[in-house]
Amino acid sequence: MRLAQRYGIALVALLMVGATVLFFWSENIINYENIKFNSPVELVWWSRDMSWNYDVQRQCGIHTCRITNKRSRRPWARGVLFYGSNIKTGDFPLPRNEHQIWALLHEESPRNTPFVSNKEFLRHFHFTSTFSRYSNLPLTTMYLPSGEALTSKDYYVTFDGKSKYGYRPSTSVVFLQSDCDTMSGREDYVKELMKHLPIDSYGSCLRNRDLPESLQKDYLNNLYSPELLRFLSEYKFMIAIENAACPDYITEKFWRPLIMGVIPIYFGSPTIKDWEPNNKSAIFVNDFQNPQALVEYLNKLADNKKLYNSYRQHKLNRRNPISNKKLLHNLVTRQYHIGDSSPGASLFEKFECAVCYHVINTARNVKADLRHYNCPLEPVYAKMEGQKIPQNVADWRAAMEVGQCQAKVLDEFFRRDIGFNDAEFDAELNRRIEGNNCSNSSNT
């Protein structure tokens, strides 16, 4: 009996000890989870161009995020953020931390950072925000303020109203560009058009007219100013040639004339017809064999009211102004567009919150591929007379080939996972170029 009693007491004591251990263990787990839940997710901007102190705490939905440019916080950061135009080839956070992702924001064409549009570079990123519909935070229609901007008649001028300006040719074509010498050979093509057609050219490229004095001061930073839109809306056609011909790379050059009720003469994104408001909203340079053939069609269109207005159904069809379901769906679901002044609506804030959400809810092994920023290695340009090529196409081809080699060098350094500087990067790049060791294989 005494033995049984002692055994029972020992058992009770053992159970109490076990319960105590279990209690403190569970408390530790709960406290750990609370710390993990309550601590903000940290993200670090990796850009020496951000010379100012940036350290903010932002509420991204249900998640609290801390975003900073203090590099000393990298060991605790869940993500490192890069802005494409500011990336320096000798400045990357290596060795990488296993718990971190790399995130890339780049809405521009590859002219400034040609290495970005290569699979060898892209595959080291877990999150992207680019013009491509396939990126994690697509910016394909970012330059279209709203669907209402397309259908509104705020700047609309009737066909007869456009035709009353007797001092202009009936074709009434405008060209407004100050970014010259582009990968797409924009000025070369416009020069060809000018041989067959009078074109009013404003801006720094091929200028033959001056903007009104009130618009000359800072029009590049006011591309959608009401005064500028009213001035341009008097024209029938506007030349809209992108800097580069990348899938889904669509800028204000396409949307602005549509907003004004002016027909765009477009060259650029090969996927542009996926995004036009209706099946016939723009004139596409690629549909014509050469500039002269395009001019012949413009002359026909400019004198035919019914045919001209058939391109402006987004303004004239009240029942169904926009028939493109893909575009309509994008306008409802997209996360960013210009002109949104609400709190937290800037491009960088949207990107930061999207990355914050991503690191919490998505597996780290998901990585970017070539579709996330797909620009061709070989510069693409419009067909010109007599199979001419743009004046500087060879220079752009060489720049893109160097960019491809840069991507391969970066890929090698990233795989080694050891820090490197500009001098080491340049030495390896020069070694490859001098040894003809940069493959020109297909970028697929």
UniProtKB/Swiss-Prot annotation:
Q: Which residues lie on this side of the membrane: Cytoplasmic?
A: 1-6
State the GO CC annotations.
Golgi cisterna membrane; Golgi membrane
Q: Which domain of life is it from?
A: Eukaryota
Which pathway does this chain act in?
A: Protein modification; protein glycosylation
Q: Identify the residue ranges that face the Lumenal compartment according to the record.
A: 28-444
| One of the Pfam families matching this protein, by short name | Glyco_transf_10
Primary location group: Golgi
Q: Which residues have a glycan attached per UniProt?
A: N279, N437, N440
Write down what this protein is called.
Answer: Alpha-(1,3)-fucosyltransferase B
Q: Which organism is it from?
A: Drosophila melanogaster (Fruit fly)
> Corresponding gene?
FucTB
